[in-house]
Amino acid sequence: MISRGLLSKGILSIIKRKNTGNLIPHVYYSEYHADIEERRKALGRLGISLYPSVTSDASTTTIPVIIEKWRNKITKSEIAMVRYTVCGRISSIRYSGSKLAFFDVLYGNKKLQVVFNKKNIGTEEEMKGKFIPRLKALQKGDCIQCSGNVGRSGSGELSIYATELPKLLSPCLHPIPVKLTNYEKRFEKRFVDMMSNTKSLELLEKRYRIIESIRKFFSERGFLEVETPILSHHFGGATARPFITSDIHKLPLTLRCAPELWLKQLVIGGMNRVFELGKNFRNEGIDATHNPEFTSCEAYCAYLNLEGMKKLTEELIRFICLTINGNLQISGQTVDLEKGFEVIEFIPALQKELNVELSPLDNSENCRKQLISIFKRCEIMLPKTCTVAHLLDKLFDSLVLKYNTSSPKFVINHPEVMSPLAKSDIKLYGAVEQRISKRFELYIGGYEICNAYEEENDPVAQYHKFQAQKYDRLQLGDDETPAPDSDFVHALEYGLPPTAGWGMGVDRLVMLMTGQSKISEILPFGSLRYV
């Protein structure tokens, strides 16, 4: 008997619901999936094997390769004496009398017509009682193998003219919806959504071409792709709430929120240009643009300043757009990447919207009270935790970014209190000296795409910035602020060269490049609520 542990959760839930917990699999299928059992038997009666291996020549040429190779060759009604064996999934079946059938076969999202003409497949005697029954035993969704000569139909459609009956490779035992539109059902069975809606498949393929282009861009510029810990005692330097677990010895562990501190330690060790594409985890809410598990790319370059990183960022965004879309126009957006990206300075832009000159923006209680009073005056809802950093972030989002969503723009010179891992500077705005960070954020089409720093490499300065964060964590209850990382400060004591660091949310970039407004659409299995 097969153990219950080998059965899928879906099957087990059905068995439990129907009080059939003692049924073994073949009984389950015969009683509750009679249609599946009947089709398997019907195929067997015709001598059709259900799950055979493919022949050795089946994978040599795929449908996309044939389409590309013969795109501009062969005239209407011409058949070339070039034979191919192709595999794919049936997307539609049409008959013309009892001697002619047309199958549309999909390989990914590329479709090729296969024409079955009785006279080309065998003699009348050989095909007697076989041709139509064998074809009609197949249905939409089945995976098949076909062999024949390439040609073009009378209507001009590129086709394979079969010289033998199709070989069933794997039957589809459930009906494929013509068009699956229910949002919840699409993500409950994402594979069915991909089979029913070619757009879903195309979006996911585009996602991975974007990721591939990011890798290519950095590799061509001398960056080495690396891996850093995902599960550790530190969650990585980002301002976020981590997922916490423990090991077998009950020692606390977290899933990383960002790889930043690990990557900078690699730079200290001598790896001067590194990048990492990988998963991060933040124990936060789910909405149209946020998922607790997400993909990011972070890159660090020794002996590069912030201006150099801005230039590199513009080059990357244009490179990806050209690679994916073939031009510098972003899908579904009136965004033109040909022009230079606009630059907005954080404090002047905020002061302009408020029509006030802000006093020094620091971690003091006076500054916090000043900002809270501005929130009340502007009738903006306060953030959950009213640290100076959170207050400034929400105020800027609400007053400045809300009305600047079209053209690409760099936001620069954030207040120091918002960027504890960035180098600092002092700048005069009117009559007020403000401590600012050497940082930029890139916004395109309303999305925050990138965040970059000239990295703080003074261990004493970094220690004091961590201590200021500690106040927010302990006194103001900000559980998104990481605890001071003494190991990282110790690493800085060995000398981090002047370094520009950069992070990009890959999921949001994919949303931008594909014109999607919901993050679930560009994730293979949707957001966390569906997995």
Curated annotation (Swiss-Prot):
Signal sequence extent: none
Compartments in which it is found: Mitochondrion
Enzyme Commission number(s) from the entry: 6.1.1.6
Transit peptide: 1-18
Disulfide bonds, paired cysteine numbers: none
Superkingdom field: Eukaryota
GO cellular component: cytoplasm; mitochondrial matrix; mitochondrion
Protein name as annotated: Lysine--tRNA ligase, mitochondrial
InterPro entries per UniProt: Aa-tRNA-synt_II, aa-tRNA-synth_II, aa-tRNA-synth_II/BPL/LPL, Lys-tRNA-ligase_II, Lys-tRNA-ligase_II_N, Lys-tRNA-synth_II_C, NA-bd_OB-fold, NA-bd_OB_tRNA
UniProt record similarity statement: Belongs to the class-II aminoacyl-tRNA synthetase family.
UniProt keyword terms in alphabetical order: Aminoacyl-tRNA synthetase, ATP-binding, Ligase, Metal-binding, Mitochondrion, Nucleotide-binding, Protein biosynthesis, Transit peptide
Enzymatic reactions: tRNA(Lys) + L-lysine + ATP = L-lysyl-tRNA(Lys) + AMP + diphosphate
GO MF terms held by the record: ATP binding; lysine-tRNA ligase activity; metal ion binding; tRNA binding
